[in-house]
Amino acid sequence: AMVEGNPDFSIDIESSNGWYFDAERFATTLTITGELYNRDVTAHILDSDVEWTRDTGNVTEDNAWAVAHAETGKSLPLTVNDLGPDYMNMTGCKFVARVLLRDGQNNYETMNYITF
């Protein structure tokens, strides 16, 4: 069968409260949507196949954060505490999502990130 559209698995990350915040009032939820062959495949992404990591430049803090958020799934609630202890002195805080899509025959893997 011929399947039309982009054969690359891709994800988008949306922010429930937009992208610009005052640091003191930072709160949002990041949500992943997936696309394969121009079709929404979000429902087929298992929460256990989503891995969130954070990059603040502080490897120890970022690793601890990743362990604490290992079971998060497709939606990641964030508060100012998730930006790391040195956020006000940093150039940004990056949140990275790595996602695996299993279709029964193939596994597709992709990643995307956003920076606050």
Task: Show which residues each predicted segment covers.
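Surface-exposed receptor/substrate recognition regions of extracellular proteins
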Residues: 1-116
